[in-house]
A protein has these predicted regions:
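Rossmann-like dinucleotide-binding domain for NAD(H)/NADP(H)
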Residues: 5-7, 11-100
């Protein structure tokens, strides 16, 4: 069971969140606050987005992961994935989304 008026944080995929339902939950007081690094649309119209401008909503510009360590890990993981894929070691490829 969720706590009363939980804080919802989405650091994953914007497509996972029904923004209209989220706005309704915030308006109804079912959620205390919302934080996100990504919205449903990768290039949202912030002027018309109903989440923007609320005191209980924080949205970062899809950049929360940027750090020296994160970039180094991303570069290393990308290279390892290419090597594993070319060797036919699909089971070792991290987060293989679409098989070829």
């Amino acid at each position: 069971l969720m706590a009363r008026r939980p804080i919802f944080i989405n650091l994953g995929r914007g497509l996972c969140v029904d923004e209209e339902a989220l706005v309704d939950a915030l308006d109804a007081g079912k959620l205390r606050a919302f934080g996100a690094d990504v919205l449903y649309d990768e290039t949202p119209d912030l002027a018309s987005n109903k989440l923007v401008g609320r005191d209980n909503v924080i949205i970062t510009p899809h950049s929360a992961f940027y750090s020296t360590t994160a970039i180094e890990d991303l570069e290393r993981l990308s290279c390892e994935n290419i090597v594993h894929f070319l060797k036919g070691e699909k089971e070792k490829v991290f987060k293989l989304v679409n098989e070829v």
